[in-house]
Amino acid sequence: MVDAALAGLLVTVMATALVQEAPHEYLGVALFAAVVAHIVLNRRWFKTLIHGRYNAVRILRLVAIAGLVACAVGQMASALVLSKFAFGFLPALPGAAFARRVHMLCSYWGFVLAFAHVGLQSKSLFRLMRTRGASNAPGALRPVIWAGRFLFVAIACFGAYSLVKLDFGNYLLGQVQFALADYGAAGALSLMRYASIAVLISGLFHYLRAALEALEKSRRRTSRAR
């Protein structure tokens, strides 16, 4: 439930054409609260950090999580400086220009890392995308599985288009300091764009993880054969 709320809030906050300044701030506070709740609910994970072997996938997961936490802290810290509504009761703080740059960088990198985290962690979400999943499914379900695959590919393609349309790369590189809303796009379209980018990122990191796991299995078989 918390994870679903996180994903929904993150997409909504990023769809800046849909929200005005005040709703954006309050949704951002709710998003940070959901991140804290997610960390608390998964606090046992921290105990596993000192156990087990670190392979490529585990290192990648750790980097994504560490970056995501850093982005969440950066977003909230910069929001304290920039806020006019949610934290409007605070005295004016200096450094608005720097805080704005930090906020934009943390927002867009946080978005990427959040859905990279989804792709690296959630095997069940993509299980039916595998060829084996379709071949082992009952005959009546196979058309549904293939339809789901085509839908995923279509959404991912729209996500790739949206990356270009929204100038996502320049935001990630820190070349844009203000959120530029496309006022010609309807609110629903703006949400669809960010949601499709989320699907694209999750899918890419899911298959990256699958490739790394397959490579590691191949290396293990080779070492055993020797």
Predicted regions and their residues:
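Membrane-embedded alpha-helical bundles that constitute the cytochrome b-like, heme-associated redox core
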Residues: 1-226
